[in-house]
Design a protein with these regions (language model features):
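Acidic, mature catalytic/reactive cores of soluble proteins
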Residues: 1-692
Length: 692
């Protein structure tokens, strides 16, 4: 999908910072800035590298100051807000256009001199390539000077003082290093060293309103200058009257050597190296679209966006899924919810298997990891649903894997893990996760929040859901049924019979205890006692009881639930986490950490449940083909959301009352994954005219 922006999109610096872009390297690293080339968040960097994939991430190249010289005049092309607004760099005044088709490019103009800028990350490596090209009329003396701003610090740090960057030449390239990180630079420009200058007072306008520290900085250690357009050195000139400046950054010396060999084969033309890397990334993204098999342009964009969240995990020598950029790492619950859309829906079968193996390795007392903290080794297990969703992900993988792709040893190990999860949950495990005598699953106590509505602010739980949450018990029934079917396939008759009996018990209790008088579902039941006020709140969690492969809900009741969701929770970009008619409804997400936490699951719109809603509409429709067409029409309206905020991505959340502006992570895995999955169901239903 192509995105074109022009001068009307950056009438002011603040307007220009409303749109951003995201590039990823498949290691957890990324490149992200606004479309005017500014850092509007502390997490914006040109090169955020993963020293250990995917969660030991360092801000290596923060941004670049860009000055175009025309004769004796100088024009600053980059834009950046500063704490003292009079210092703001307003290069957007010279920016004519921005184009993004998976990779960003800019066109600037000053005094008739045109500057184009392109950049790309290199998938699978911590590398960044940037190219500037100047076009000037004959006889016009123009050149560009760039001043990189480096971080060399952990992604979330805001150093007031920095460790000195050591710089030296190594095989005709610049080698920069600190105790923790090192970086190579190849360039066809002239590097001019300068005394290290620390920049502390960038203003990050998109952090301030969210209650985050809205400032940060970096340091400058050199300038890089291009050739002049009037020079006669043909090696630094391409096309008619144009000059190139290329910067190739990398953290792996072997990778840099490969690029040097490529450069030497093209008569030391670093532009050819850049073009190779640029085209390589374009082709990679195109292949993802083709492999997805999706038809509509919107769905094909979602496929690329979903694949962007796939990442390597070094600790298991395998794959995982980044929950959201720029804030989150790979989380258990998010990974399992996004699993289908980020792997199976785009034909990434090997990645799917590897992700399951990654989490199997960390399973403890029947619980899958909830969180791998940024830059730390310990794993957090405070989740009840990740394990149940793992079993669902395993089932979906086994339904998709071909006989040729089948790995009997993996399947046997995975089924053993799934069986152990059921066993631990039955007898009870950590965090008060246990099966009650009625067969239903209860979890949580004290300050531990174990469902996706897990916010905790100090000792305050804005959405306490201790007891028996509705979606957890839908997942529980589904997981028991899946393990039953897998054991049946293995000929385990006794175990199969026991799980069959258990599934019937769960279903009977669920329908009796969770069904409200009007046919909709209670959100959560107290562990011991009758439904309370929290039970009766209308939340989006009941939608997940309709979309599991094994569901307890019949069509008649499903239609009642869908009607309530449509009436009180539905928006075109997601479902509200709480009915807008509830006295506790928060119409806006923003402000201090406390204000944001209190609103997070109290009406804020979440994109990912929308996929489940659309799939349920098709599944329980009397006319699935017609319903699927209507769903496709609604999904195509996501073009507007894809063009807002981070281009080509769907955000984590939106305001509850008027969901016009994205909030939270600007690129969320389960958002794009679940909407892509809804596309798959809808396109299939249109073709075959049946329920999914």
């Amino acid at each position: 999908m192509d995105f074109y922006l022009g001068r009307s999109d950056w009438k002011t610096l603040q307007r220009g910072e409303e749109h951003s872009f995201l590039l990823v390297n498949g290691l957890g690293g990324y490149c992200s800035q606004t479309v005017i080339g500014s850092n509007a968040r502390h997490d914006h960097n040109l090169l955020t590298a993963a020293l250990v994939a995917p969660t030991k991430r360092f801000a290596m190249v923060r941004r670049i100051e860009e000055i175009l010289h025309v004769g004796s005049n100088a024009y600053r092309l980059d834009s950046q807000a500063y704490v003292t607004s009079s210092d703001d760099a307003a290069g957007f005044r010279f920016l004519d256009s921005f184009f993004y088709d998976g990779l960003p490019s800019w066109e600037y103009m000053a005094e008739g001199v045109r500057v184009t800028k392109r950049l790309t990350l290199v998938y699978g490596t911590n590398s960044l390539a940037i190219q500037y090209q100047l076009y000037a009329d004959e006889g016009v003396d123009a050149w560009i000077e760039v001043i990189p701003v480096y971080g060399f610090h952990s992604k979330n740090d805001r150093p007031l003082t920095y460790e000195t960057i050591s710089c030296r030449k190594k095989e005709d390239r610049l080698f920069m290093s600190t105790k923790e990180a090192s970086l190579y630079l190849d360039t066809d420009g002239d590097i001019e060293s300068m005394e290290e200058e620390q920049v502390q007072w960038y203003r990050f306008d998109q952090d301030g309103p969210d209650g985050r520290d809205g400032w940060g900085g970096g340091r400058k250690i050199h300038k890089i200058k291009s050739a002049h357009t009037t020079e006669e050195d043909i090696d630094k000139r391409v096309l008619n009257g144009s000059v190139m400046l290329n910067l190739i950054y990398g953290m792996d010396e072997n990778w840099m050597n490969i690029q040097r060999e490529r450069e030497e084969k093209t008569q030391n033309d670093l532009s050819a190296v850049f073009s190779h890397l640029w085209n390589q990334e374009h082709e990679r993204q195109k292949a993802v679209m083709e492999q997805s098999g999706r038809v509509s342009e919107t769905a094909r964009q979602l496929a690329v966006s979903a694949q962007a969240h796939l990442t390597r995990r070094d600790s298991t020598d395998g794959m995982s899924i980044m929950a959201g950029f720029p804030f989150f790492g790979d989380w258990g619950r998010d990974t399992m919810i996004a699993f289908y859309g980020c792997t199976l829906a785009i034909g990434q079968m090997e990645a799917a298997k590897s992700i399951l193996q990654t989490f199997m390795r960390y399973c403890r007392r029947g619980i899958m990891p909830n969180l791998f903290p940024e830059g730390k080794d310990e794993v957090m297990y405070n989740t009840v649903d990740a394990s149940l969703l793992f079993i669902n992900a395993l089932w979906e993988y086994l339904q998709h894997v071909t006989e040729k792709e089948c790995d009997p040893s993996f399947e046997a190990e995975a089924i053993k893990t799934a069986e152990s999860i059921i066993s631990w949950y039955e007898k009870g495990t950590d965090y008060n996760i246990h099966m009650e005598v009625d067969g239903l699953l209860a979890a949580g106590n004290g300050l531990w929040q174990l469902t996706w509505m897990d916010v905790r602010f100090g000792d305050i739980l804005p959405t306490p859901r201790h007891g028996k949450p509705v979606e957890i018990n839908a997942y529980w029934y589904n997981a028991v049924c899946i393990v039953r079917e897998l054991l049946k396939k293995q000929g385990e008759e006794e175990k199969t019979a026991r799980l069959d009996e258990l599934s019937e018990k769960i279903k009977k209790s669920f329908l009796k205890k969770f069904t409200k008088p009007d046919g909709t579902l209670y959100d959560v039941l107290p562990e011991n006692g009758e439904p309370d006020d929290a039970s009766k709140q209308v939340r989006c969690n009941e939608i997940f009881a309709l979309t599991m492969p094994f569901t307890m809900i019949e069509a008649k009741q499903a239609k009642v639930i869908l009607a309530q969701v449509r009436r009180e929770l539905y928006t075109p970009v997601g479902l509200r986490s709480l009915s807008m008619y509830d006295p506790q409804f928060h119409p806006h997400y923003g402000g201090t950490q406390f204000e944001r936490d209190m609103a997070y699951h109290q009406g804020t719109v979440w994109a990912y449940p929308l996929g489940a809603y659309y799939r349920a509409c098709i599944r329980f429709s009397d006319e699935p083909k017609q319903t699927a067409k209507e769903v496709l029409h609604q999904l195509d309206q996501l073009n507007a959301a894809l063009a807002e905020g981070c281009l080509g991505q769907i955000a984590e959340i939106y305001d509850g009352e008027c969901p016009a502006e994205s909030r939270g992570c600007f690129a969320q895995a389960w958002s794009v994954a679940e909407l892509l999955r809804a596309y798959e169901d809808a396109e299939t239903a249109v073709v075959f005219g049946r329920n999914i």
